[in-house]
C-alpha cells in the first residue's frame, strides 16, 4: 500500500460548516494526485460500511491537499472520474486558519452519493507557496468526518 492512515485532532472548529476535530490523515509518498482518489474513496466507503450509517451518519467530510501546485480543476476532474454524480458550485473564499498557520482556498462541493447517502462535501486547498518544500517531501491528504471519527477509531 502506498498510504498509511493516522488519526489527527486539529483542534476546535473554525466555523460551524467546517469541523476540524478528530480527523483522519492519509499520508502518501510522492504519488500523483490521480492516485489518491481510488484509495481515499475506497476507504471512505469501507469506513462508513463498517460503522453503519444509522449510528455514525456521514454528513460531511473534507480533504486537505497539502500541495501548493495542485490546481482546482485537476481535483474536480479526478473526482468526477471516480465518483460520478459530483455537483459543485464555484464558491471560493479565502480565510486564515490558525490551526494550520497558513491560508487556504475553500472550495465547497455539494451533492454526492456515498453508500446510498446524499451528503455535502468540500475541499480545502492550501495556496501558500511557503509550504512547497515541505509538501514535496511529505504530501498528504486529510479526510475529516467531524467528531464522529474518534468513536470509529
Swiss-Prot record:
Q: Single Gene Ontology BP term?
A: DNA damage response
Keywords noted in UniProt: DNA damage
Its job: Involved in bud site selection. Required for resistance to the DNA-damaging agent methyl methanesulfonate (MMS).
The protein, known as: Bud site selection protein 25
Amino acid at each position: 500500500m502506498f498510504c498509511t492512515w493516522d488519526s489527527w485532532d486539529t483542534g476546535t472548529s473554525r466555523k460551524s460548516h467546517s469541523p476540524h476535530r478528530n480527523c483522519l490523515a492519509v499520508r502518501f509518498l510522492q504519488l500523483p494526485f490521480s492516485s489518491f482518489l481510488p484509495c481515499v474513496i475506497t476507504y471512505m466507503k469501507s469506513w462508513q460500511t463498517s460503522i453503519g450509517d444509522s449510528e455514525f451518519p456521514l454528513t460531511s467530510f473534507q480533504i486537505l491537499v497539502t500541495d501548493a501546485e495542485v490546481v482546482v480543476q485537476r481535483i474536480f476532474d479526478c473526482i468526477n472520474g471516480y465518483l460520478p454524480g459530483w455537483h459543485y458550485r464555484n464558491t471560493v473564499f479565502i480565510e486564515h486558519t490558525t490551526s494550520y498557520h497558513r491560508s487556504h482556498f475553500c472550495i465547497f462541493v455539494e451533492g454526492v452519493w456515498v453508500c446510498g447517502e446524499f451528503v455535502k462535501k468540500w475541499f480545502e486547498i492550501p495556496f501558500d507557496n511557503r509550504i512547497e518544500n515541505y509538501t514535496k517531501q511529505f504530501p498528504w491528504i486529510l479526510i475529516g468526518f467531524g467528531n464522529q471519527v474518534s468513536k470509529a477509531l
